[in-house]
Every structure is written in C-alpha cells, then in structure tokens.
UniProtKB/Swiss-Prot annotation:
EC number in record: 1.8.4.12, 1.8.4.14
Cofactor(s), names only, from the UniProt record: Zn(2+)
Active site, per annotation: U95
Gene3D superfamilies per record: Peptide methionine sulfoxide reductase (2.170.150.20)
One GO MF term: actin binding
Protein name per UniProt: Methionine-R-sulfoxide reductase B1
Record organism: Bos taurus (Bovine)
C-alpha cells in the first residue's frame, strides 16, 4: 500500500463475481476473476494476467520489488506488480486501480466469445 496513492473509489476491491477484467480504455483482456484474491490493500489484487502480453512492465527505480504496469495494447496506466508478494510463495501481486478496469461478467464473456 505504501507504493500507491489512495484516492478511494476502488469499486473492484471486494468484487468477486466470475468474469474478466479488461482495460477501461481499449477493452484488452487483462485479468481473470480466477486470479483475483482478497488483500489488505484498498486496490483489487490479482496473481497473474490473462495473456503474456496483457500488461507492459516498467521498473520503479526508486522502489525495489515494484514494477509499474500498463495495458499491453494501449499503454493505459494500470498500477503496479509487486514481486513475490502474492498469496503463495513466488507469486506476484498485481495492485490495480479500479478506474483502469472494466468488468465483463462470465455470461457476457461467453456470449461475446460465441459471436453473439
């Protein structure tokens, strides 16, 4: 929590419905609800991305263990990845701003993938 500024309005912090989280700016798939977990920080936390290129990463030179992440498609700022700070040993914690995400419920995700 010390690496991010908290402005409130984190609507996805305690949101655990099945579905996917996409970039609010371009709609690119970022995180699955299966990788989301409860964390004490005020931001939604995820252990992994949907695709290897879902996020672009840039080191935080003044913050060891913190990496700035942005959308892998459009560059929209998403938050941070904290190395080895996930729920299991060796996992990362992606600390993501709710305002940078749009949620697509599982039912809509299935319909969209079937071309409906």
């Amino acid at each position: 929590m010390s690496f991010c500024s908290f402005f409130g309005g984190e609507i996805f912090q305690n949101h655990f419905e099945p579905g996917i989280y996409v970039c609010a700016k371009c709609g690119y798939e970022l995180f699955s609800s299966r990788s989301k977990y409860a964390h004490s920080s005020p931001w939604p936390a995820f252990t992994e991305t949907i695709h290897a290129d879902s996020v672009a990463k840039r080191p935080e030179h003044n913050r060891p263990g913190a990496i700035k992440v942005s959308c892998g498609r459009c560059g929209n700022g998403l938050g941070h990845e904290f190395l080895n700070d996930g729920p299991k040993r060796g996992q990362s914690r992606f600390u993501i701003f709710s305002s940078s995400l749009k949620f697509i419920p599982k039912a809509e995700e299935t319909s969209a993938s079937q071309g409906q």
